[in-house]
Curated annotation (Swiss-Prot):
Subcellular location: Cytoplasm, Nucleoid
Family in the record: Belongs to the MraZ family.
The entry's keywords: Cytoplasm, DNA-binding, Repeat, Transcription, Transcription regulation
Annotated ranges, domain SpoVT-AbrB: 5-50, 81-124
Alphabetical GO biological process terms: negative regulation of DNA-templated transcription initiation
GO MF entry, a single one: DNA-binding transcription factor activity
GO cellular component: cytoplasm; nucleoid
Gene (name only): mraZ
Name recorded for this polypeptide: Transcriptional regulator MraZ
Major subcellular site: cytoplasm
Length: 144
């Protein structure tokens, strides 16, 4: 599982270090690589362990090829996916189309989201986090 927020930099080649805690979690789960794709709700990159990606692909393959709405989503988001390996320094190379999609500049933020990880441009992340959540949209995680 992935939790926490980590500030990092991305270099001119598109390389950024995956936080050590995330690398440790991947190693403990026996996950050799991650899949990067467009995050559909914000301008961010979503990173999924290979096993989570495989679950997603299985769902996609079970969908009807005649469902236009589903196919549009597959075309938009699943087709943006790139399998990537970490280099010996624990860095990932974010492909140019994903850097463009998320507007990744020099400063980036890795955010653990439980089973997945998000990668944001720092300015976009700060803006997203400063926005108020309307009271009727707040989820009560502690309700029993």
């Amino acid at each position: 599982m992935f939790f926490g927020t980590f500030n990092h930099a991305i270099d001119a080649k598109g390389r950024t270090s995956l936080p050590a805690k995330f690398r440790e979690a991947l190693a403990a789960a026996g996950e050799p690589r991650i899949v990067l794709m467009q995050y559909p709700h914000w301008r961010a990159v979503q990173a999924l362990p290979q096993s989570v990606w495989n679950e997603l692909v299985k769902k996609v393959m079970e969908a009807s090829p005649l469902d236009a709405r589903w196919q549009r989503n597959v075309l938009k988001f699943v087709s943006s996916a790139h399998e990537v390996d970490l280099d010996v320094h624990g860095r990932v190379l974010v492909p140019p189309p994903l850097r463009e999609w998320a507007g990744l500049q020099k400063d980036v933020v890795w955010v653990g989201m439980g089973r997945t990880i998000h990668l944001y441009d720092r300015a976009a992340y700060d803006e997203q986090m400063s926005a108020e959540i309307p009271a009727d949209q707040v989820v009560d995680f502690f309700r029993t």
